[in-house]
Amino acid sequence: LSGDQALVYDCHLSPDRARLIRDTLAARGARRFNVILSHWHIDHVAGTEPFADCEIIANPRTLAHLTREKAALETGTYAGPPAISPLILPNRIFDDRLVLDLDGETVELLTFDIHSDDGTVLWLPKRGILLAGDTLEDCVTWVSEPEALPRHLPEIARLAGLGATAILPNHGAEDVIAKGGYGPGLISATSAYVTGLIAGTLSPDLATAIAEPVKAGDLRFFAAYQDVHSRNLAKVAEAKAAGLLT
């Protein structure tokens, strides 16, 4: 937020929560809103309706996924209720890199093939701040495209090349984010985890699998993610059995 302009990175889980975001920013003086979608997954696009009169920015893959699944998302049949109706599609499309100006501060939108093939991160180069969407997650990534994991590794390395000193993922420990975010160790921990998934070397026990980055302070252990880890291992095993991942 700067002056009367607000950049909104993702629009939350539901229209009512997105409306609260807009109302809160408006109460602080915002009159112009630009929404950036980090990727097409439901928990990031469900609140588009309150921003229907605004510029909604995404890359062409995000637009393609949302267009393909629009009917199912709006009827609540894609991944179950609630229905996202109406789903407002992006109306400004870019690829690779888009530079925005927020009252003199450079804001870069960059595309990455991590977690999903349509990732968009928000990078503030002057301050070293990276809004990572779901490209990074504490304490482990959610594998949605297991066959793409080998593509993700060089993309994670490219993400590290930005040199971010403060990383704000969409899913992470609230206290870490409130204190300014994660360090670059979150990226190396993600790379190590993806490498272990591909190689099949990770312990089925989450605490054991991520013991080193937790000890180093790069991750926070969260017991509920044991289910995510188990699901990731199963998804990778299924992809290997189907010949989609070697």
Regions found by a protein language model. Name each.
Residues 1-23, 27, 121-134:
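Conserved beta-strand hairpin/beta-sheet module of binuclear metal-dependent hydrolase folds
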Residues 9-11, 33-41, 57-60, 112-113, ...:
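Active-site neighborhood of phospho(di)ester-bond hydrolases with catalytic His/Asp-centered motifs
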Residues 13, 70, 142-147, 178-182:
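Short, solvent-exposed loop/turn segments at secondary-structure boundaries
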Residues 14-16, 40-46, 63-66, 116-119, ...:
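Active-site environment of divalent metal-dependent phosphoester hydrolases
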Residues 18-19, 23-99, 192:
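Active-site HxH/HxHxD metal-binding segment of metal-dependent hydrolases
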Residues 93-124, 129:
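Core dinuclear metal-dependent hydrolase active-site scaffold
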Residues 144-170:
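An active-site-proximal "capping" alpha-helix that borders the catalytic cofactor pocket
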Residues 161-162, 174-246:
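Accessory terminal helices/loops
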